[in-house]
Amino acid sequence: MKNMFRGCLSLKKIELFKFDTSNVNDMSYMFYQCESLKRMDLSKLNTINVDNINGLFSECISLKFIDITTFRTRLLLQPERFIPDVKGLIYKHKSIKGIITCYK
């Protein structure tokens, strides 16, 4: 799924609940430069085998909400891997209202 939607500048919404991702190991830059994307619900994806989420949401400047409640990958402990400079992104763009994870 690496680069799958990369550069889809007009992509505003996508539902991925029918995707079988049980064997996917690379989701790097999957939504890179999806500048119109506002909400992303990845809670239905099976991510147990994913080992690369670098830049997953890089340059998604309109993104306001991300739901990754069922993401099952140790990489979530490092949010800077899928949202580079995660603190800077929130402060610079101020558009992200929330990231829901399974971790507390």
Please provide the spans of the model-predicted regions.
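Negatively charged
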Residues: 2-104
